[in-house]
Amino acid sequence: MLNNGSDGLVDQHTRFLMRFDNDFKVDGYPPPNIEDGLEIKGGEFVTDSIRTGYKYTNTSNSYGMINTSSTLSPDLFGDGDPFTIDFWYKPLAVIDACSVGHEWYNGIFYFGIAGNAGDLGLFFATQRGANGSKVSDAIIGRWYHIAMVRVDYTLYGFVDGKRSVSFPCSNISLRYSNIDFNRQRDGSNRASFVIDNFRISDVARWTSDFDPPK
């Protein structure tokens, strides 16, 4: 039976869903193996008028990691297989930093705040940053729905359901590297944001504009 609660986020293609409702709730179909596969440190649950999420800050012990090789099935997430990662994201400061990334340095995708000096904003990148673009201003305290979709050798990036970028990317398995929250390649966990409803799906859910899930 699909454990989709009231938000409908779990369907037959949801393989990992991490909710932050004043507790860590991990769902999926079937339920994912999270033993030794999930590490969350140094943050806190926060609630605003819209939703409850998990807050990371620019301190050295505030980060998270999903061990993809233990939580995702090799039968569904092999080389070249499509996937979708989507989540809700609220910046708390405009700081040049990666918020969600496929572990440096050969990862498939990176999302956070970056750009030219004095012009930082929401930013997608692939191939160690060789392909990257600011796609929106980062408004402090505003919730954004973020989605990254891999189809063959292309990564599509979406903000609030609007397709913002399409970049060449690696077709390696998503299981090749871990997924990091607020862990920077230089060891400085300096981002400051809130995240909620982090979902990994085994299909390309969207390749054009869509209405974000709640």
List each language-model region with its residue ranges:
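Extracellular glycan-recognition modules
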Residues: 12-15, 24-29, 62-121, 155, ...
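Short structured motifs
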Residues: 65-73, 128-134, 182-184
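A general structural signal for stabilizing positions within well-ordered secondary structure
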Residues: 8-9, 137, 189-192
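Short hydrophobic/aromatic patches on beta-strands that form ligand-binding or substrate-lining surfaces
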Residues: 16-20, 85-91, 146-148, 181, ...
